[in-house]
Amino acid sequence: MKHTEKSAILLIYTGGTIGMKEDPVIQALRPFDFSQILEEVPELGKFAYRVDSYTFDPLIDSSDVEPSLWKTLAALIEERYDDYDGFVVLHGTDTMAYSASALSFMIEGLTKPVIFTGSQLPIGMPRTDGKENLISAVEIAAAKDSNGHAMVPEVCICFDNVLMRGNRTSKINSDNFRAFRSENLPPLAEAGINIRYNTGLIRYPASWEARPVFHKDLDTRVAILKMHPGITPQVVRNILCGPESRAVIIETYGAGNAPSKRWFIDMILEALGMGKVILNVTQCIAGSVNMDIYATGKCLKDAGVASGYDSTTESALAKLFHLMGASPDADYVRKGLETDLRGEISK
């Protein structure tokens, strides 16, 4: 692994806790000026590469994130792609996994890292996790192998010394520094005294010379139905058969199981008959959908429900937005859902 003197990283601050510090005058948190990042994190100045910054205006609370942000991010990375060796996106933690998943599908053929990070405590607080997260993310974004290629040319989340594939990651804790976890895929890298890269898991481009393709068309007409004991036919019908959606993600029990009651299967068939795509993902934080194990899962498969395998809900949603934005054809979308596009599922 090496860094070159010509390496340059673009730090993109969208909003979130990491960029806040206390204003002694008003005695409240406010965003600091990221053009002065070396004053807040002087350790970055010790690296042999340049770190530039770009700040969104206005800043976006992660609870207010919309797909329009993802399009803006993709357009910014596309515009600056030739100017930088890697990109670090500072983002609020609540929807970071959604944004990282979305960018992974929107950028095809990445040859440079796009690393999302943030913090649980503001960077201006003494015990902040923000500095370590930022330093690790920048170092990984700048890291190259002996051939001068990026060590991790993927969209990732770097948090609490662990680098995870973005579309495999979920936020699992609201008050712990280990806020994110990738249950179905081991880390791509871990930062200790040294940064250890799991090169056997990292996805590399078919061509290092080819420019990535940026897909910015998204169709967000997706609903999510979370199964639970006592759910009523009317609630299921409103979500499955509502005219506003083109697709429905069903969060099922265990290995992809759902009620085998006739009314439920009839509503599945009705929704599919309307031309909708239905995707089965598990409510479990680890494991995979397998609709061949139990009769309750096989009913869904026989009806025409697509398997999400071991996809996270965040990744499944972003993937549907991407596929539906690419084509109005339900069969195209369904086939794409059951295809591993960016390392988001294991089959």
Where are these regions (language model features)?
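Short glycine/serine/threonine-rich phosphate/pyrophosphate-binding segments
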Residues: 20-21, 95-100, 130-134, 257-260
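Short beta-strand segments
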Residues: 12-14, 89-91, 115-118, 153-160, ...
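Gly/Ser/Thr-rich loops at beta-strand to alpha-helix junctions
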Residues: 16-19, 91-97, 163, 254-257, ...
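C-terminal non-catalytic interaction/assembly regions of soluble proteins
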Residues: 252-347
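Short Gly/Thr/Asp-enriched flexible loops that form oxyanion-binding sites at enzyme active sites
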Residues: 89-112, 260-267, 296
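Internal gly/pro-rich beta-alpha loop/helix module
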Residues: 116-193
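Accessory alpha-helical/coil subdomains and C-terminal extensions
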Residues: 2-6, 12-16, 33-45, 165-255, ...
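ATP/NTP phosphate-donor binding region
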Residues: 1-79
